[in-house]
Amino acid sequence: MIATILTATDGSEPAAVAERYAASLAARLRARLQGISIVEDRLAKGFADDGLGLAPPSMEALAAYLKSRSDLALRRLGERARAESVEFHSEALQGIADDLVVERAQQADLVVLGRDGQHARFRSGLVGSTADGILRKTAKAALVVPQGAQLSGPLLLAFDGSPGARTGAQIAVYLATRLGEPIHVFVDSKDKGRAVARFDEVRGLVGSLPVPVREISSTLGRPDVKIVDSAREVRAGVIVMGAFGRNRITDYFIGSNASAVVRTSPIAVLVAR
């Protein structure tokens, strides 16, 4: 089901965490790893005549630095893949980062991204601009890795009955089987009747697994907060959830619960579509 994993790296420490996670996941799933590093146009071509009569600086040295950084990032990723005995291919590109990742992701089954980018320390937001753009635009499942995340422990499946959550359940079954980890199913149970129906549905989707399946419900608090809290409590290695809730409005933005979980979780989050 997951034969090719795509990961993008900018060489930063947050990206290095995602590199390790992607290489380890590819090894355990026996998947190929495709690495890309992108020299962004806004950096390589960001200085131009702005009408003030001030000539822009020479870009040759900056372009050479950015290209060298991109090549070194891919070399580091390749070394990690080889250490895990993973088949690895790489590509260095120049352009608009999120658009190029989305384009290359069409040939992959899963995209793995660092949550924070190279400039994380200079901003107040909690998701890097490139990762945010990819999550908004891609039609592929995306795994967002925060700093400190480890590929160990059970899976937490947040299930709300949406199409994305059903896809997430299928991915969770695949991952749990291949990783040999249990699944904890979280359902927001403020509406008891709906909660019962959702647990019944997810039991049918999960089927008869060779790993334990446990159920968690919550009647209090915001679902995104309870999902993260539950994942912490069970020491989950990954949270799996749909990109959109049942009240989906637009194709362009991921749902509010998924967005909040991605922003705040200390655990990797797989967003399914």
Which residues make up each language-model segment?
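Small/aliphatic-rich secondary-structure junction motif
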Residues: M1-P57, E84-V86, K137, Q150-S218, ...
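Gly/Ser-rich helix-loop-strand patches that form or flank binding pockets
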Residues: A15, E19, A26-R28, S90, ...
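Short, well-ordered secondary-structure micro-motifs
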Residues: G46, V102-E103, R123-S124, L155, ...
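A short acidic, glycine-rich active-site loop
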Residues: A55-D71
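A structural motif corresponding to the C-terminal end of an alpha-helix
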Residues: A73-F88, L209
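Charged docking surfaces used in two-component/phosphorelay signaling
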Residues: A92-D99, S218-D224
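A short, acidic, amphipathic alpha-helical segment used as a generic capping/interface helix at domain edges
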Residues: R203, G221-R232
